[in-house]
């Protein structure tokens, strides 16, 4: 099969999926959200690294991990991490706020990727510096895909929160915590069943707050780009035994909360 030179020229003019994603970022998203502030990227930065699979097995639950390379000290720490997916209908995935009590500003979530795109993480330090890492993911159709049959269980258990420490609890050191909230996280862009013309409005978890012994660990502002049953991994530093409280809200003014006792000797299960 021969391809005309006109088609090849048009494709070259349009650019590769990576080029188009970069254009969407530079022309729109970067200026809208960070104006003319300098963002340090590539080999010039050694603050964070975003990891995601190059090819999504399931575009509705793409795992994204952000690894940070500096300690959270009172003098210098990552204050916010912004996550964007350039080619999603709503590019912002979420904004995550941290404190020195986080120990590390690492974060892991599962996201919906609607079309092949770069996923970007921008770390904003308390000093005002901005650093970016990105990873390209091949995917399509996540935001407009009907939810899986398991959504019924999410609706039935709406707002139920499970928490666990990953590994042994170590006082005075960063400990990895996992939180999962049952919620359908509807995008407002897809019918509940394939072939249906009825599209329910967006309905998703929009805030997530974690407090340990009355100290803020992480607060998140989220969009429907977060997958069904939002799962969040993060760090915290327990100086002593105490209580972790997780609170979430959704776009229907729902509010959900759960507590978990942290002790050095307690088996680590919710």
Question: Predicted segment positions?
Answer:
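Extracellular Ig-like/FN3 beta-sandwich strand-entry sites
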Residues: 114-118, 174, 239-243
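N-terminal export signals
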Residues: 1-8
């Amino acid at each position: 099969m021969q391809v005309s030179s006109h088609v090849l020229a048009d494709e070259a003019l349009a650019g590769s999926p990576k080029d188009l994603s970069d254009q969407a970022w530079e022309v729109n998203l970067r200026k809208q959200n960070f104006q003319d502030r300098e963002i340090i990227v590539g080999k010039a930065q050694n603050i964070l690294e975003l990891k995601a699979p190059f090819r999504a097995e399931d575009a509705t639950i793409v795992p994204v991990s952000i690894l940070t390379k500096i300690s959270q000290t009172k003098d210098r720490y990552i204050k916010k991490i912004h996550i964007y997916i350039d080619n999603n209908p709503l590019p912002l995935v979420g904004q995550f706020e941290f404190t020195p009590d986080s120990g590390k500003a690492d974060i892991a979530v599962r996201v919906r990727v609607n079309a092949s795109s770069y996923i970007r993480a921008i770390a904003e330090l308390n000093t005002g510096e901005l650093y970016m890492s990105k990873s390209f993911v091949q995917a399509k159709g996540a935001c407009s895909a009907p939810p899986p049959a398991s959504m019924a269980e999410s609706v039935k258990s709406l707002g139920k929160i499970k928490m666990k420490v990953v590994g042994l609890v170590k006082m005075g050191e960063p400990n990895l915590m996992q939180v999962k909230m049952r919620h359908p996280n509807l995008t407002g862009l897809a019918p509940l069943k394939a072939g249906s013309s009825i599209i329910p409005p967006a309905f998703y978890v929009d805030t997530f707050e974690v407090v340990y012994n009355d100290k803020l660990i992480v607060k998140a502002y989220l969009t429907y780009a977060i997958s069904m049953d939002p799962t969040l991994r993060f760090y915290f530093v327990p100086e002593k035994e105490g209580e972790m409280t997780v609170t979430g809200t959704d776009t229907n003014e729902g509010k959900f909360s759960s507590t978990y006792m942290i002790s050095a000797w307690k088996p680590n299960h919710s």
